[in-house]
């Protein structure tokens, strides 16, 4: 009986992964307005009933898609935190590489996350996910730039640079983004040429780096 139950759970998880991959692709390629149960069913090549079973309402589907995109961006963030812990003095270049990856390898996920940021303005339930996005990056930057206020300023500027780089006319210019981000963070360094304090350690094993229910 346990094996049967485990098998069903695994199939259910695989199906949700399939549906959310399709949902994120729709949002990233066509915009939030294109995200419907029927569109996900068609993109995932499953029945409409399968989508509504896992995500009964449009809000359920939208929030799950945003969290899924955020979790995949979170894997990139975990890479960033790990590298920063190993090479704290190289943080500007590491962040430059991170943002370049967001607009290339993780372009669709990143667009979906920005759709979430905009949607959070009128959907309070998305607020915690948005705030976690900003808080985790700011915590990483604080030791380098010297204060929480400066870290949140840099975080907001990074979001603006990434958003600009996502525009179609900038899609083939990740190198310019990398340089701009590295330069921005160097300009905000608390003590130019001085030592860099210890950075935020990687999240504990088992903690999802972008899970809105996990502590900041």
Could you say what each language-model-derived stretch is?
Residues 67-73:
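Short, basic, alpha-helical segments at the C-terminal edge of helix-turn-helix-like DNA-binding modules
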Residues 126-127, 131, 144-210, 216:
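Hydrophobic/aromatic-rich alpha-helical bundle segments in the mid-to-C-terminal region
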Residues 1-5, 213-216:
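Short, intrinsically disordered or compositionally biased N-terminal tails of bacterial proteins
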Residues 18, 22-30, 76-83, 112, ...:
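Solvent-exposed, amphipathic alpha-helical segments
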Residues 74, 103-114, 119-153, 179-183:
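Amphipathic alpha-helical packing segments from all-alpha helical-bundle domains
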Residues 18, 22-60, 64:
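Helix-turn-helix
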Residues 77-110, 154, 178:
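Hydrophobic alpha-helical connector segments
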């Amino acid at each position: 009986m346990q094996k049967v139950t485990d098998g069903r759970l695994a199939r259910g998880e695989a199906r949700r992964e399939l549906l959310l991959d399709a949902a994120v692709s729709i949002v990233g390629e066509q915009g939030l307005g294109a995200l419907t149960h029927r569109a996900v069913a068609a993109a995932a090549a499953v029945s409409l009933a399968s989508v509504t079973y896992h995500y009964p309402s449009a809000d359920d589907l939208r929030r799950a898609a945003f969290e899924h995109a955020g979790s995949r961006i979170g894997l990139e963030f975990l890479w960033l935190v790990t590298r920063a812990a190993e090479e704290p003095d190289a943080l500007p270049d590491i962040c430059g590489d991170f943002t370049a990856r967001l607009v290339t390898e993780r372009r669709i996920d990143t667009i979906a996350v920005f759709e979430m940021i905009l949607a959070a303005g009128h959907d309070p339930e998305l607020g915690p996910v948005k705030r976690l996005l900003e808080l985790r990056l700011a915590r990483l930057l604080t030791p380098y730039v010297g204060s929480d206020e400066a870290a949140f300023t840099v975080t907001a500027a990074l979001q603006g640079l990434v958003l600009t780089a996502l525009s179609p006319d900038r899609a083939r210019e990740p190198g310019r983004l990398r340089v701009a981000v590295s330069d921005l963070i160097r300009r905000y360094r608390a003590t130019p040429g001085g030592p860099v304090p210890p950075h935020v350690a990687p999240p504990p094993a088992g903690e999802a780096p972008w899970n809105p229910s996990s502590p900041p």
